[in-house]
Amino acid sequence: MTITVEPSVTTGPIAGSAKAYREIEAPGSGATLQVPFRRVHLSTGDHFDLYDTSGPYTDTDTVIDLTAGLPHRPGVVRDRGTQLQRARAGEITAEMAFIAAREDMSAELVRDEVARGRAVIPANHHHPESEPMIIGKAFAVKVNANIGNSAVTSSIAEEVDKMVWATRWGADTIMDLSTGKNIHETREWILRNSPVPVGTVPIYQALEKVKGDPTELTWEIYRDTVIEQCEQGVDYMTVHAGVLLRYVPLTAKRVTGIVSRGGSIMAAWCLAHHRESFLYTNFEELCDIFARYDVTFSLGDGLRPGSIADANDAAQFAELRTLGELTKIAKAHGAQVMIEGPGHIPMHKIVENVRLEEELCEEAPFYTLGPLATDIAPAYDHITSAIGAAIIAQAGTAMLCYVTPKEHLGLPDRKDVKDGVIAYKIAAHAADLAKGHPRAQERDDALSTARFEFRWNDQFALSLDPDTAREFHDETLPAEPAKTAHFCSMCGPKFCSMRITQDVREYAAEHGLETEADIEAVLAAGMAEKSREFAEHGNRVYLPITQ
């Protein structure tokens, strides 16, 4: 079926910045690769380059044609194995060189982390529109944004718009979780226009092919669906192969049972047929298919906890042990692997999840949904989960799957997508700071300096969301002169601590009080003066009162 759509997407640079590129040479082919950055031009005359995920949509020199799709990047190789296999062979691929420039890391570090299985480069040979990126704990923490239609609402145009909107605000990957009509067509439009890797959960489309009845699923239907998606260019796929028949009873006394859609589908199939999941029994064949296209496994946590009460229970960790076994099998076949994690976990139980995943899964990159640190805030779960996300990322999680304010309530719209992405970029960056990631603090320092110097426009431009920062400032001080004023509406001109601090510093400079030695010298001189004055008055402690 042909779908005619004319999606309308946001283009143009983010406020206060422009698209910039760093040119590098692709190893082997010699092709020129353009590595993108968001360049913030500061009022001081300097500039600050930021990691950028927005693709050509923020480049004023690019004409966007959604029907034609994005241009293909050079250096794509289809017949020399996976990134894992090539890294093990000592090769630095074009994708690794691109990532090294993007992350400001050495290409050898990129290759070594991929070779060890501690990082993955989701880059299907059939998705040349994407800009290479890496997921691993040695690199900046990444954020995934889920989009996709449902049987109730949304359209292809809306989902393409959400994809562009999410990447504009910093989504490093996109997952198309469509479960409604036209799943193939929706995915095609997204893939051809996505500058970031795209992930899916193939069991959703396979279920559509059997009219929504999990018991009618077969390995053949699932396998053909996977190949269809590989051919389209899907970069990574969630596979719930760790949901085993014997684990299902472990969920019986849970407060919220099995909350993963894929997990519940496979549990229903196992119980109906009373045999092991076809994803588990055919896993090696699946590995060969993934390796053929260099599709990355995202081994799904189908038994993740959906409530604080169920956190870190027997079902969750039983599945994790099986995911560890499957990780070894996948890597033996040359397929890249990352591991999905929870879920709903109270703060004091979060770190245990990372430590166990690293132990059981050979330090494969951990990719977690939050986790939500409490269950009591529907409509604010982008906040409850960002708290858990920051903690788990500091502990070693490599990619965070965002949660929007609509979680548990409905399908997210454009505003929800942005709110979710921004909340998770905050969590990811906070974790990078805590881990001491190279260059992470440079942006904080640049913004803090601009704040102290009352360079309001520079503050806006360096922030995660320049539009909202400016909007909030304009609500009370909209005039242009306010953008250089040495105060804001919070404190006003007389109570601004930073202005007062500047006044103190100016006074100190004028009176030679800039160093500790200066201050000690002045204090000593003052004390000496008072000592002389005391002596001049006869060394008397009490002096007569004068009228």
Curated annotation (Swiss-Prot):
Cofactor: [4Fe-4S] cluster
Pathway the protein acts in: Cofactor biosynthesis; thiamine diphosphate biosynthesis
EC number: 4.1.99.17
SS bonds (residue pairs): none
Annotated GO biological process: thiamine biosynthetic process; thiamine diphosphate biosynthetic process
GO terms under cellular component: cytosol; plasma membrane
Function, in words: Catalyzes the synthesis of the hydroxymethylpyrimidine phosphate (HMP-P) moiety of thiamine from aminoimidazole ribotide (AIR) in a radical S-adenosyl-L-methionine (SAM)-dependent reaction.
Protein name as it appears in the record: Phosphomethylpyrimidine synthase
Native source organism of the sequence: Mycobacterium tuberculosis (strain ATCC 25618 / H37Rv)
Upper classification of the organism: Bacteria, Bacillati, Actinomycetota, Actinomycetes, Mycobacteriales
